[in-house]
């Protein structure tokens, strides 16, 4: 966006690193950032004022669905029985990285595992980011890790390259997916074909939730319009920068959005012939 938009408009965009969805919500609410990437789950929490968020964030608007956050629950083969997420019970008294503390990764991991009946009080929880989780798996310090990310996830690639036949990414059955979706219809089945990761010799049947771009409601309509337009006019350019953006497409732009669209984004989508459902029209 910065490369394509700044030379022709007065819109300047700069990226910052954060601890993820939870911190992005806080920074947007405080006005320190105008745009942020949120997991779909955190977007639903934020709009409804439920879960771990302290309030309903009614000053937020959706801009676009980005790519899907694909759940990778990677464990050592010695705990695998069924090959599904229910095998997480075999990690009781073992060490598992849930993600960085207070991150969206931790939040969604706890939500999913709670929904399928896994008691995390019985698991020795480590709070590690993606790279450190892969390192800890390789070093034998943990027995599993939670990596929700676009495919291919670099931490999972590293784990499979180094541990190959010693690890498994757990599947989800239709019944388990229904349990996860009992509060919010966010997750969908996601197939990771064999060969996506090094030494991965069979398909992985996991689930995914949308990652969304959100904006403060007070960002000018024209700015959001230009940014949204620039994103979709330059998808091929984005694909070369980040492989996860290859999953983006205009026809998926409003799928799974948990809060109303910013009027600037809505204007662009209407121009493209996309019908916007009533629930996504900001009052």
PLM feature spans:
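Ligand-binding clefts/hinges and TM-proximal coupling segments of bilobed small-molecule sensing domains
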Residues: 87, 92-111, 183-257
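Bilobed "Venus flytrap"/periplasmic-binding protein-like clamshell domains
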Residues: 1-14, 69-139, 236, 255, ...
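Short, glycine-/small- and polar/acidic-enriched structural segments
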Residues: 1-93, 100, 169
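General small-molecule cofactor/ligand-binding pocket signal
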Residues: 14-16, 124-126, 170, 277-279
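Extracytoplasmic/secreted proteins, especially bacterial periplasmic and envelope-associated proteins
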Residues: 4, 23, 27, 32, ...
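Pocket-lining segment of extracytoplasmic ligand-binding domains
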Residues: 40-42, 50-52, 77-79, 119-219
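Sec-exported extracytoplasmic/periplasmic mature domains
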Residues: 2, 6-10, 29-33, 48, ...
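An extracytoplasmic/periplasmic, membrane-proximal ligand-sensing/linker region
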Residues: 132, 149-164, 169, 222-283
């Amino acid at each position: 966006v910065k490369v394509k938009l700044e030379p022709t408009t007065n819109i300047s965009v700069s990226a910052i690193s954060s601890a993820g969805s939870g911190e992005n919500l806080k920074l947007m609410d405080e006005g320190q950032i105008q745009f942020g990437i949120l997991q779909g789950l955190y977007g639903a929490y934020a709009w409804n004022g439920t879960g771990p968020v302290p309030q309903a964030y009614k000053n937020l608007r959706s801009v676009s669905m980005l790519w899907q956050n694909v759940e990778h629950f990677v464990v050592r083969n010695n705990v695998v029985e069924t090959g599904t997420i229910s095998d997480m019970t075999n990690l009781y008294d073992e060490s598992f990285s849930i993600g960085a503390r207070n991150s969206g990764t931790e939040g969604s991991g706890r939500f999913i595992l709670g929904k399928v009946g896994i008691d995390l009080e019985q698991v020795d929880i480590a709070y590690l980011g993606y790279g450190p989780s892969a390192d800890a798996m390789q070093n034998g310090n943990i027995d599993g890790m939670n990596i929700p990310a676009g495919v291919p996830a670099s931490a999972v690639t590293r784990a499979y390259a180094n541990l190959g036949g010693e690890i498994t990414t757990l599947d989800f059955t239709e019944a388990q997916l229904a349990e996860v979706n009992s509060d919010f219809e966010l997750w969908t089945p996601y197939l990771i074909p064999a060969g996506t990761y090094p030494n991965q010799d069979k398909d992985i049947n996991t689930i995914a939730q949308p990652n969304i771009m959100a904006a403060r409601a007070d960002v000018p309509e024209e700015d959001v319009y230009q940014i949204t337009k620039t994103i979709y006019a330059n998808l091929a350019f984005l694909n070369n920068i980040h492989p996860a953006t290859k999953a983006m497409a205009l026809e998926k732009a409003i799928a799974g959005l948990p809060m109303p669209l910013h009027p600037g984004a809505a204007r662009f989508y209407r121009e493209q012939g996309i019908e916007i459902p009533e629930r996504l029209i900001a009052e």
